[in-house]
Curated annotation (Swiss-Prot):
Database matches in SUPFAM superfamilies: alpha/beta knot (SSF75217)
Protein function: Specifically methylates guanosine-37 in various tRNAs.
Pfam families, A to Z: tRNA_m1G_MT
Protein name per UniProt: tRNA (guanine-N(1)-)-methyltransferase
InterPro entries: Alpha/beta_knot_MTases, tRNA_m1G_MeTrfase_C_sf, tRNA_m1G_MeTrfase_TrmD, tRNA_m1G_MTases_N, tRNA_MeTrfase_TRMD/TRM10
Quaternary organization: Homodimer.
Taxonomic source organism: Helicobacter hepaticus (strain ATCC 51449 / 3B1)
Catalytic reaction(s) noted: guanosine(37) in tRNA + S-adenosyl-L-methionine = N(1)-methylguanosine(37) in tRNA + S-adenosyl-L-homocysteine + H(+)
Primary gene name: trmD
UniProt binding sites for S-adenosyl-L-methionine: 108, 128-133
GO BP terms: tRNA N1-guanine methylation
Compartments reported by the entry: Cytoplasm
Keyword tRNA processing listed: yes
NCBIfam families listed in its UniProt record: PRK00026.1, trmD
E.C. number: 2.1.1.228
Amino acid sequence: MQFSFLTLFPTLIESYFTDSILKRALQNGLISVEALNIRDYALDKYQKVDEPPISGGAGQVIRADVLGAALQTLTHSHIIFLSPCGKPFQQYDALRLSHKKHITFVCGRYEGFDERLVEQYANEVMSVGNFIVTGGELPALMLCDSIARHIQGVLGNADSLQGESFEDYLLEAPNFTKIFNQKIKFSATPSEYSKGNHSKISGLKKRLAICKTKYFRPDLYQAYRVFIEQQQLNNKVVK
C-alpha cells in the first residue's frame, strides 16, 4: 500500500518511518511512503501557502489554489483530510482502510483549510479526538500506523491482531509478566493465567475484558451491551 502525506513539514513524517515496525514494513516493500511538501505547489518565489480568512479574524488559512494544485496530482488516491470536525477514527476504520491501494493524508496547519478544498477533494474527513494539536501530521501518522498494522506481513506475528482492544467493543484483557525481582512487591496475578488450561484462560480473559471496559470506558461498555443484544436477536431470527 502507498501512503502519501501532504504537509508543510515533510521531515516530521519521514522521521517516523526510521525505526521499529513501520521501518521494517517499508524495507520489505509492504508499504511505501511519500511526504509531499505543499510549498512545492506555491505560485510565487516565496512559496506562500496561506492567507488570512476573508471573513476576518485571527490566524491564517491554507489557500485553496496551492493545496488544490497538489491534490489534482493525486487522482487515484483515497484522500483523507485531518480535521477536528471529522468523524472520529475507529478501529474498524483501520481495518476497512487497510484494503485501499493508495491513501493520502492532508495535514492542516494554522486555522485549517479553505473549506472548498474539503468539499471538492475529500473522500473522508477524520479526527482523532475532541482536542486541538498544532498540525495534522501527528493525527495522520496515528491513522497510518493503525491502518498499516492490518496489512498482511507488517506485524511479525499476525496473532497479535487477535483480541486487541476495541474488538467487539471491548478493551483488551489485562496482561501480566513473570516477576524476577522479588524485592519489589506486587499483587498476585489471576491463578488461571499460569495453569495452562487455554479454554479457562480464554474465558477468564473475556470476563476480565468486560470488567475492564465497564470500569475504564463505560461508553464503550454500553456499545458492547447493544452489540451483544443485537447478536442475540439475530440468533433468534436465524433459529
